Swiss-Prot record:
One of its GO terms (molecular function) is small ribosomal subunit rRNA binding. HAMAP family: Ribosomal_bS20. GO terms for cellular component: cytosol; small ribosomal subunit. GO terms for biological process: translation. This is Small ribosomal subunit protein bS20.
Amino acid sequence: MPRHESAKKRMRQNEKRQKRNKSQKSRVRTKIKTLRSLDDKEEAEELLNDVKGDLDRLAAKGIIHENKAANRKSKLEKHVDALE
């Protein structure tokens, strides 16, 4: 356990940020799973735009790496393009 006040504060801040980041990543993962389960191309395209924005937002905030966001967007676009 930290002894200094600043270390205690840093620990509290890290826990708070970890919870926020985890919930944001979980929300995006849920949207991705929903997108992959869709069979209708129009619905999938609408959700794809939403997911792409979320991935860009996470990458901009440093929650996920920019390349990881780009790779996920690319794979999801291929998936939606393959739908009929």
